[in-house]
């Protein structure tokens, strides 16, 4: 039985006072962090994971591999609170969990450094590091991951301080629960095992303890039973529900992600080590990196076991993330950032101690001996570190005006014909799915985002089964068409704003060319000419996009490369309201054999963003080679405007007439020019 020593009354009061001060500092950290996170929070559903996770949480569904059951069960009740829309609720809870994680990390850093001021500064520095801050701006699993990771480290430290087995048992259960949120938790297990062994030795690992820990771990990780249970009701978004043991295994092991592991040879991890260094500088700045290194060295000398524990977490994180090739790999650096901020805490504590000793030697006639005067000036200067983090990263992570994913989804929903098939990658499918499964908009649309869509044999199978021909209309999202070479070679793709309309059976090429003289109204460089612009036929209904037709022709200097037409909407003061691009693809039929003298018609649709006020606006077009940042010169720019933009039309936006989730949608009432 564990021995329990009752503290004296005086000691108990001191403990209460310390705990009360910690509670106040934790509250301040939550408040400061949350205010910063709400300032930059995205106002709506985002691309990819964000929309998918919101949709799944609202319906108690299954996310992409491995499913994230812990996150779903926590977020579901909050997604049902009738405040704002569903996206706001889940985004807010993500930000709130981020703020709670910062408070938990303060307790970790205060314990490691032995200094509250140092713990406060280190936690606030982590709070406004770019990667973590960015994860608080929209629905994501990583703020909860940091919460659980910080709690796990606190339990390790509590076990060390008390020696009570209950912390080990509770930690075993929590690790299982944490794995139900993200697999990054597994990287902590070797460090925890080392620390327990270093503290207690081999004799601590008795059969009884191991059995209890294993049972509690199994209880925690049994949260994955959520996946097959919920799959029985097939909840939205319907992309990941496992209905068999094979599908369950595939969901847990993420075969698509495994293909990106250890796939680049032995040189890439070495190159990634340099990338880690650059990211650390970007996250914490030179001052934060210097303090982190200084603190890491001090911790190694003072507490070797704890230092190795944190180092093992960092090393396993670096080794794992350096061998994983995904576009958002930077979020996998968060365990390293947690460890680095611990070094910052130790470094800040050491600086404060040195300054305090120096100030103690100053005569009391010059400086008051109170702690405020001994440590206050140095603490205020070191507080510049999180302040610089905030100011440097604010613009990088600010998503408060980011409506791009919602505008895209509403544009697709408004232009797609009834019963259409939408083929896209997960990043574009998810926001359309939010409209369908949460707002109930366009429930007739069929969306397909399976991995086999990228495989040529998969497309051939669909074609053999007349899969594509069975739908009244098919749309492809632009990014995906760059990868689907076979589709571009076999089908006819017509650009329509943010998507391509797919015609499985190509019409004759001569039928696709406009029978008008190829005399350009405006030239973009010596490569592409715009012959004319026409308003598309048909009335514009409130809330729907307005359409126009552009007629393009190649010029003498045309080099056979793909070009992008970029459309920009500006107000009368020249402020940009909206922008999107469209591919004039040379390898898209019928432009694959485009020749001088031929004119091709392109239909384009624009969906106005909600914040557009009634008034007059100018619509410009500019052209650039695909993949280039510089645009081609325009030979007929508007007076007083830059030399790359051609004025397509001036449009009159009237009073809003249709309702969206956030309010009324602006409507184009007239084309003033041309």
Give the residues covered by each predicted segment.
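C-terminal luminal/periplasmic domains and tails of membrane-associated envelope-modifying transferases
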Residues: 16, 410-433, 439-674
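Transmembrane-helix signature of polytopic, membrane-embedded enzymes
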Residues: 23-26, 105-128, 147, 166, ...
């Amino acid at each position: 039985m564990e021995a329990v020593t009752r503290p004296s009354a005086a000691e108990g009061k001191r403990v209460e006072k310390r705990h009360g001060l910690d509670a106040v500092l934790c509250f301040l950290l939550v408040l400061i962090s949350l205010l910063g996170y709400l300032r930059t929070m995205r106002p709506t559903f985002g691309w990819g994971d964000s929309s998918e996770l919101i949709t799944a949480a609202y319906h108690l569904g299954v996310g992409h591999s491995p499913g994230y059951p812990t996150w779903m069960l926590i977020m579901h009740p909050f997604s049902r609170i009738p405040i704002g829309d569903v996206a706001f609720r889940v985004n807010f809870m993500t930000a709130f969990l981020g703020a709670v994680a910062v408070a938990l990390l303060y307790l970790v850093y205060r314990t490691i450094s032995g200094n509250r001021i140092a713990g406060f500064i280190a936690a606030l520095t982590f709070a406004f590091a770019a990667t973590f801050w960015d994860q608080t701006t929209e629905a994501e699993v990583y703020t909860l991951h940091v919460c659980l990771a910080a709690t796990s480290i606190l339990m390790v430290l509590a076990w060390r301080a008390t020696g009570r087995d209950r912390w080990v048992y509770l930690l075993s259960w929590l690790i299982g629960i944490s794995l139900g949120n993200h697999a990054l938790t597994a990287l902590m297990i070797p460090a925890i095992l080392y620390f327990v062994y270093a503290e207690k030795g081999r004799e601590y690992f008795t059969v009884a303890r191991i059995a209890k820990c294993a049972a509690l771990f199994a209880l925690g990780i049994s949260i994955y039973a959520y996946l097959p249970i919920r799959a029985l009701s097939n909840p939205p978004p319907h992309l990941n529900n496992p209905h068999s043991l094979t599908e369950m295994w595939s969901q847990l092991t993420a075969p698509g992600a495994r293909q990106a592991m250890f796939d680049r040879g032995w040189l890439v991890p070495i190159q990634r080590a340099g990338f880690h260094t650059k990211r650390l500088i970007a996250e914490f700045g030179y001052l934060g990196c210097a303090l982190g290194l200084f603190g890491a060295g001090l911790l190694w000398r003072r507490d070797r076991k704890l230092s190795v524990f944190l180092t093992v977490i960092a090393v396993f994180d670096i080794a794992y993330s350096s061998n994983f090739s995904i576009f958002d790999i930077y979020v996998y650096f968060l365990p390293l950032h947690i460890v680095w901020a611990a070094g910052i805490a130790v470094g800040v504590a050491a600086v404060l101690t040195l300054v305090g000793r120096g100030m103690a030697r100053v005569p009391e006639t010059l400086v008051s001996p109170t702690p405020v005067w001994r440590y206050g000036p140095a603490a205020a200067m070191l507080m510049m570190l999180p302040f610089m983090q905030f100011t440097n990263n604010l613009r990088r992570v600010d998503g408060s005006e980011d409506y791009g994913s919602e505008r895209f989804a509403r544009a697709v929903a408004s232009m797609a014909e009834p019963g259409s098939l939408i083929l896209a990658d997960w990043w574009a499918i998810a926001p359309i799915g939010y409209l369908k499964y949460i707002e109930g908009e366009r429930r007739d649309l069929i969306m397909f985002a399976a991995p086999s869509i990228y495989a040529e044999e998969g497309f051939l199978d669909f074609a053999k089964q007349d899969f594509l021909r069975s739908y009244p209309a098919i749309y492809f999202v632009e990014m995906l068409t760059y990868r689907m070479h076979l589709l571009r070679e076999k089908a006819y793709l017509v650009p329509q704003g943010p998507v391509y309309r797919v015609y499985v059976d190509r019409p004759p090429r001569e039928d696709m060319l406009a029978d008008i003289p190829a005399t350009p109204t405006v030239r973009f460089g010596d490569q592409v000419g715009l012959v004319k612009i026409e308003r598309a036929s048909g009335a514009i209904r409130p809330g729907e996009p307005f359409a126009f037709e552009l007629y393009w022709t190649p010029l003498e200097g045309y080099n056979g490369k793909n070009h992008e037409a970029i459309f920009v909407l500006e107000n009368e003061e020249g402020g940009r309201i909206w922008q999107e691009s469209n591919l004039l693809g040379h390898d898209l039929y019928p432009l694959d054999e485009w020749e001088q003298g031929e004119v091709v018609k392109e239909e384009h649709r624009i969906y106005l963003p909600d914040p557009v006020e009634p008034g007059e606006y100018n619509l410009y077009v500019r052209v650039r080679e695909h993949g280039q940042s510089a645009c081609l010169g325009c030979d007929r720019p508007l007076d007083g405007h830059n030399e790359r933009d051609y004025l397509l039309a001036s449009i009159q936006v009237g009073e809003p007439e249709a309702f969206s989730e956030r309010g009324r949608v602006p409507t184009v009432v007239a084309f003033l020019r041309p």
